[in-house]
Amino acid sequence: MNSLVATPPIPPHFYEHNRFNTTSRFVSPMNPAGSRKRKAEDDNGSSDHDTRMSASPTSSPALPTKPLAARQIKRPRPNLSGRPLSLGRLFETLDSDALRSVLRSLCDRHPELGQEVVDTAPRPNITSALQVLSNYQSTLQSSFPLGGNPSSDYAYNRVRPHVMNLLDALNDFTPHFLPPNETHPSTSLNYLDGVTEIIHQLPRWDTPHYNLEKEAAYEEIAKAWALVIREASKRGGGIQLQYGEWDQKLAKHNQTSGGKLQDAVHELSASLGWMAGNPSHPGPGCPQADTASIRQQLLSGTYGAGLPLKVGPW
């Protein structure tokens, strides 16, 4: 009876105290000195690191700063809807044929725009004009029927519209390169040289009266040659005609055409009467021939080459 002693009850706050102290009993004790040493090293390292980071460099060069361009960001339209193209974008979609059609239609409906277009458009040059004529020539050559006689009446009827288109273009382009509209004789001569080659390529037909169109083209181009030669002979004593070998070029064209350019050849001979081998040039005793001979020697730098050099008092 004496061994069974009633155990007094344990107050609740005692359990709370033991619960908080239970973890500390299982944690291994740490070295106080080591803990203090590591803490001092960490503090010193952190202090040195802060000092290095806060210090500004003394020897590093200053890098130039470039101002950044403000980016222009296109924001999407809040209300997107269909709309037609602007005039500039519309022109970008048109090829040369469509653009010519639009301009021709505008000029027909508004005649006052025609002169403004002429004043605004760049002046046609030899290359562009001959290219247009060459395109007509290529269309003509490709329109011949396959097989058969290319100079027959059947072939003529097939290609006649293209022949007329080429001849109409020749009649329109040639006056543009003639004086007084064209003030440079070299430009006129080079154009006539190229366009005469195109006339040489016109077909010859078995029926004689079908060839009248080509002969008329030769007649007109011969008149153009004569006009340009007369104007060129007035500039610089005809030096462009003499040193441009135009006598040889024109003689070759005349031979290819079968003598259709003989009038132009005579005009060139009259303008350059001192040329060797010219049957129409004046005789040696004529004052005009003597003047031309002196001019020729001055231009070639041989004047006075055969005269003795006089030394001493005059």
Swiss-Prot record:
GO terms for molecular function: proteasome binding. This is Tethering factor for nuclear proteasome STS1. Its main location: cytoplasm. Keywords: Cytoplasm, Nucleus, Protein transport, Transport. Residues 54-68 have a biased composition (Low complexity). It is found in: Cytoplasm; Nucleus. Residues 24-85 are annotated as: Disordered. Involved in ubiquitin-mediated protein degradation. Regulatory factor in the ubiquitin/proteasome pathway that controls the turnover of proteasome substrates. Targets proteasomes to the nucleus and facilitates the degradation of nuclear proteins. One of its GO terms (biological process) is proteasome localization. It comes from Coccidioides posadasii (strain RMSCC 757 / Silveira). Belongs to the cut8/STS1 family. It comes from the Eukaryota. One of its GO terms (cellular component) is nuclear membrane. The keyword Transport applies. Residues 39-52 have a biased composition (Basic and acidic residues). Binds the proteasome. Gene3D superfamilies: Tethering factor for nuclear proteasome Cut8/Sts1. The gene is STS1.
